[in-house]
UniProtKB/Swiss-Prot annotation:
Tree of life domain: Bacteria
Taxonomic lineage of the native organism: Bacteria, Bacillati, Bacillota, Bacilli, Bacillales
Pfam families named among the record's database cross-references: UPF0180
Family recorded in the similarity comment: Belongs to the UPF0180 family.
Protein name: UPF0180 protein GK1051
Organism whose genome encodes this protein: Geobacillus kaustophilus (strain HTA426)
Length: 80
């Protein structure tokens, strides 16, 4: 299953993705994003640790204003 990086403050999203079988890793910095198929960030820092620019070639989803369910749907859409 895909490896999804999620900011630590998004615990509900982490749990929802784990329930769907994804390998979830907390994004604390640039190193954590390496090898992720997709990253979910809060949007407070839209370029957390350079993730948009360098580290991951996968999609980056901004979680602000979305429910955990909506984020899971976006992850699934992006990984198709």
């Amino acid at each position: 299953m895909a490896k999804i990086g999620v900011e630590p403050s998004l615990t509900d999203v982490q749990e929802a993705l784990k329930e769907r079988g994804y390998d979830v890793v907390p994004l604390r910095g640039e190193q954590d994003a390496r090898g992720c198929d997709c990253c979910v960030i809060t949007g407070l820092d839209a370029n957390i640790a350079g993730i948009h620019n360098i580290v991951t070639s996968g999609p980056v989803i901004e979680a602000s204003g979305l429910t955990a369910e909506e984020i899971c749907q976006k992850v699934e859409e992006k990984l198709r």
